[in-house]
Every structure is written in structure tokens, then in C-alpha cells.
Amino acid sequence: MKLTRRLTLAAFASVLALGTAAPAFSADLIAIITPAHDNPFFKAEAVGAEAKAKELGYDTLVMSHDDDANKQSEVIDTAIGRGAKAIILDNAGADATVAAIKKAKDAGIPSFLIDREINVTGIAVAQIVSNNYQGAQLGAQEFVKLMGEKGNYAELVGREADTNAGIRSQGYHDVIDDYPDLKLVAKQSANWSQTEAYAKMETILQANPDIKGVISGNDTMAMGAIAALQAAGRKDVIVVGFDGSNDVRDSIKAGGIKATVMQPAYAQAQIAVQQADAYIKNKTVPKDEKQLMDCVLINADNADKLETFALKN
């Protein structure tokens, strides 16, 4: 489904620590639900949303669904039971999420989605996501340049249930496939996991010792790939990621991973809370439900400016 609106990216450089749990029932509560916080992208979302909610005077209930649709349903039930005024959600899968959001809507609780869209409109008040296709094309263009437009490469993709995995892969291939001397020799899902990416990269490398590059659907998998390559003494292999994490920033500065694409996790979450606040207070809805935020290429030229999914001035 085509996304129709772009938001201006504001630089949010500082990150506040996660606060304490909300009271059992709060008259002004915003629930913040994301995948597990061991991924720095999802942690930044939660921290950004909580910081903005507290700034606006709300109590917060921060929960994780761990990319499990059943657990997502349970934590949304918790938000409903606590009387949340709004839910900020990075969901556990486009198809599995529709019923959960509808359940919240039927209970009078509006949902504001971040990062991952669903394929249905009119259930969530807003869907604020990165322009994954635009970002993937940026990353692919840099990858082609780094590869010198030729050589064998592998692709690590994310969870199949996550729409972002497919959008990013399509964006990559719509650029790379125009270069016939770039040969895809392996394409495997590592489910956004660093551990899985390490294991998959070991297997790919054994089967394709002449591999020259790896393009990854997120930074966590890119970190797993670079670790496996370095363990095998293959520091010559080009790795490009997607997210803009501090870990990959540091790897770029150290000469490991060559590039990534920053998506504004912290800013997305804060904008979602601002829109939730406007809805709670005035029933104000955004002009467009689906809203895009552009991504930014990060490489050795600007890695110093990257801090927690935002560029410092």
C-alpha cells in the first residue's frame, strides 16, 4: 500500500533512561509496546516515546511483545485493563496485529503505530514509519559503489512476517539488479537476530569463499555478519546495514562495516506521542494515517554525527 505523507525529521540526540512502571490504574496513561529492547532500535523507540509522554504529563506503561503475536495480544489486554488513553505500538507482524488493534479501538483506546505498518487503514489513528524503500535504495546505491559494480554478494533479510523486511529487500534489488556483474549467491533470513546472522554468515562463507559483499536488512544482522567474517579472517568483505545504530556507527569508524542507513527511531516515537496527545485532548487526527519519514545514508563521512538514530548538528 502506498504511503502518502512525509514528516520532517527532527534531530533528537539525547536519550533518557526508561522510567518506573505505571500505577495499576492511571487516569492519564500511555502504553508503549515494542519488540525486545536488546535491539537498540526498539529500545530507542521506547525511550523516545516515554520521554515525550512524561514531558507532556502522562504516566507510562512500557512493555515488550518480543515479536510474538500472542504476547502482543496479552500486553494490549494489559493496556486496556489499565485504562490507557492511547497505545504507541511497534507491532509483532502486520497480519497478526489487525485484530489486536481493533480490540483496543473497540475498547475506546486509539493506537499509533511506529516503524512497522499494517495493510489495513481505519483501525489505527496513525502509522508513522520510516521510508524503508527510499532508505534501502540509498543503502543499495552505496553498496554498488563500494563493490565497484561487480562481484558475488549475499543478502541477509529480516522476519518474513515483518513488512519492512520485504520492502527493504525490494528496494535493494531495484538498484542492485541493474548491475549484471553483481551476483547474488545467497539470500537467507536471520530474523533480525545477530546470533542467527553470525551462524548464517558462517554457512554462506563456507559455501561461497569468493564472496565480496553482504547487504543486510538491519544493523543487528550486519553486526553478526561482520563478526563472523572477522572471525574467519575476511576483513576484505564489504558489509552494509540498515538502522543507524551506535554499534554500527562505531564499527564504521573502526573500519569494519562500511555503511548503514539511519531511520529515525527516536523521532518517530516522539511524534507518535505528540499525535496521541492531540487526539486525547482534542480528538485531533493527522491529515494522513500513513506517514513517512525519510532515511539518511551513514558512512565514514558522517558517522561521527550519528547518535542514537539521529544526526547531531
UniProtKB/Swiss-Prot annotation:
GO terms for cellular component: periplasmic space. Transmembrane segments: none annotated. CDD domains: PBP1_TmRBP-like. Its main location: periplasm. Residues 1-26 form the signal peptide. D-apiofuranose binds at residues 39, 115-116, 162-164, 168, 218, 243, 263. GO terms for molecular function: carbohydrate binding. InterPro entries: Peripla_BP_I, SBP_2_dom. The keyword Calcium does not apply. This is D-apiose import binding protein. It comes from Rhizobium rhizogenes (strain K84 / ATCC BAA-868).
